[in-house]
C-alpha cells in the first residue's frame, strides 16, 4: 500500500464500524466515510476533474472536507487546502499559481468569488443545501469513474507557504513524501486502532498531515477542532476531555496558552498518551512545567519545514532545572539524513554552527510550477550538533519569521504594507515570544499625515491571511540602514523595544 488513500481503505476493511472522523455536527464511521468519499468521487467525475488537475479547498474543517481530500487522492486529483479566512485576493494568487479548475467553498464566500478573478472557475458549495451550488445538487448519474494508474511519486497535495516576492509558494508533496512521515510517526509513537487524535492545526498547515493520515492509517479517530475554539484555551482543554483525546499535536504557543489560561496543568487530562509539538521553540520554563504535570505522557519536539515535513525529532525526558535554552530538535526522522553545512558546502563538525540540510523520502518534489527539487534541501535553519548527536536550533538564516507557530516571509508582509498609498518604506519584525509574540510594521510615510493602525490592518486584511496582519505599527522619518545600505534590523529592534 504505497498510496495515501489505500491506507484508509485498509482501515475500512479491518475496522468498518470504528469512528473515523468527527466534526462539530457529525461523526462518520469508516463505512460511512467510504460512502461519502464515493459521493465526492462521483461529483468530481461529473464535473470533469481529471488526474493531475488541482482543486482548491477554501472551507472550514468538516467530515466532508476530509472526504473530499480522500476522493481527490483516489482520482489522482491534487488538492490545495487554503485558509478559509484568507481574503479572496490571496485565493486568486494561489489559484493562478496552481491553475486550479475547481473551488470548494462555503456559501458565505460565493459572492466574493463572483466578484473576483475566479468568477470563471467552477465553484461548489459544501455547507448549504439551499444553495444552487451545493455539491449534492450536481447530477452525477452519468459520471464514470476512470481506471487510473497512480504512482507513489505522483503529486498528492500542495501546501502554500509565504513567499518572499509577495506571491505564495506551493510546496508540492507526493504520496510517497507523506507516507514516509506517516509510517515513521505511526511506528515511533505506537499509534493504535481506536485511539483518538485531535486535529488542532488548520488543514493548510503541515501539522495536519499527522492528525489526518496517521489516524486513518491505523484505524483511529480524528476529531476536528473547530476553528471557533482554536485559540480558546479552556475550550481546548474541555475538547480533550469531551472527546477522550489520546494524541495531541500543535504548536507550543497553543499548549502554553492552555497551560496558562486553560487549566491544562491543574485539570489533568488522563486520556492523553502522546503530546507532540512543532513549529517554534518551546520556552523551557513552560515545557518543564508540562513535563512535570504529565510525567507519564510521551512528549516530543518534532522539527522540519513544510518542504520536508518532520526531518528531526527529540524525545523530551526530565529537564535539567538549570536549563534555560529550548530543548534540542533531536536527530534525523522519517527516514531522512540530516547534517549541518558550512557556506562552502562542507559539513560541520560537532559543535560547529551551520545550515540544516535534509536528504530523504520526505523532501518535497519542488515548488509547484517551478524546477523540481534536486538533491539535498537546504532549510535555511541554523543548527549545531551536540556531542550526544542531537541538533540544537539556533535561528533562521534568511528573513523567515515565526509568529505563534505560523511561518511568515517578511517580504510578503512588507509588500502588502508598501501597497498602501501612504506608505513609502516598510520593514517587519517580531517582538516577544510564544503567545506574546507580536508582528510589528515599521513604516515611513509619504506625507506627515499619521498612519492609522486600524486602516493598515484593514488594508492588509484584503491581501493577507489573518496571521500575517501586523499587530503594532511604528512610524519613523527614515528606516535605519547599515553601511551596505540594507535596513539595520538590529537598530530597528532597539527602536521598537525601546
UniProtKB/Swiss-Prot annotation:
<dbReference type="InterPro" id="IPR000873">
    <property type="entry name" value="AMP-dep_synth/lig_dom"/>
</dbReference>
<dbReference type="InterPro" id="IPR042099">
    <property type="entry name" value="ANL_N_sf"/>
</dbReference>
<dbReference type="GO" id="GO:0016874">
    <property type="term" value="F:ligase activity"/>
</dbReference>
<dbReference type="InterPro" id="IPR010071">
    <property type="entry name" value="AA_adenyl_dom"/>
</dbReference>
<dbReference type="InterPro" id="IPR025110">
    <property type="entry name" value="AMP-bd_C"/>
</dbReference>
<comment type="function">
    <text>Involved in the biosynthesis of pyoluteorin. Catalyzes the conversion of L-proline to L-prolyl-AMP and the transfer of the L-prolyl group to acyl carrier protein PltL.</text>
</comment>
<keyword id="KW-0547">Nucleotide-binding</keyword>
<dbReference type="InterPro" id="IPR020845">
    <property type="entry name" value="AMP-binding_CS"/>
</dbReference>
<dbReference type="GO" id="GO:0044550">
    <property type="term" value="P:secondary metabolite biosynthetic process"/>
</dbReference>
<dbReference type="InterPro" id="IPR045851">
    <property type="entry name" value="AMP-bd_C_sf"/>
</dbReference>
<keyword id="KW-0067">ATP-binding</keyword>
<dbReference type="Pfam" id="PF00501">
    <property type="entry name" value="AMP-binding"/>
</dbReference>
<comment type="similarity">
    <text>Belongs to the ATP-dependent AMP-binding enzyme family.</text>
</comment>
<dbReference type="GO" id="GO:0017000">
    <property type="term" value="P:antibiotic biosynthetic process"/>
</dbReference>
<dbReference type="Pfam" id="PF13193">
    <property type="entry name" value="AMP-binding_C"/>
</dbReference>
<keyword id="KW-0045">Antibiotic biosynthesis</keyword>
<dbReference type="GO" id="GO:0031177">
    <property type="term" value="F:phosphopantetheine binding"/>
</dbReference>
<dbReference type="GO" id="GO:0005524">
    <property type="term" value="F:ATP binding"/>
</dbReference>
<dbReference type="InterPro" id="IPR020459">
    <property type="entry name" value="AMP-binding"/>
</dbReference>
<dbReference type="GO" id="GO:0043041">
    <property type="term" value="P:amino acid activation for nonribosomal peptide biosynthetic process"/>
</dbReference>
<keyword id="KW-0436">Ligase</keyword>
<dbReference type="GO" id="GO:0005737">
    <property type="term" value="C:cytoplasm"/>
</dbReference>
<protein>
    <recommendedName>
        <fullName>L-proline--[L-prolyl-carrier protein] ligase</fullName>
        <ecNumber>6.2.1.53</ecNumber>
    </recommendedName>
</protein>
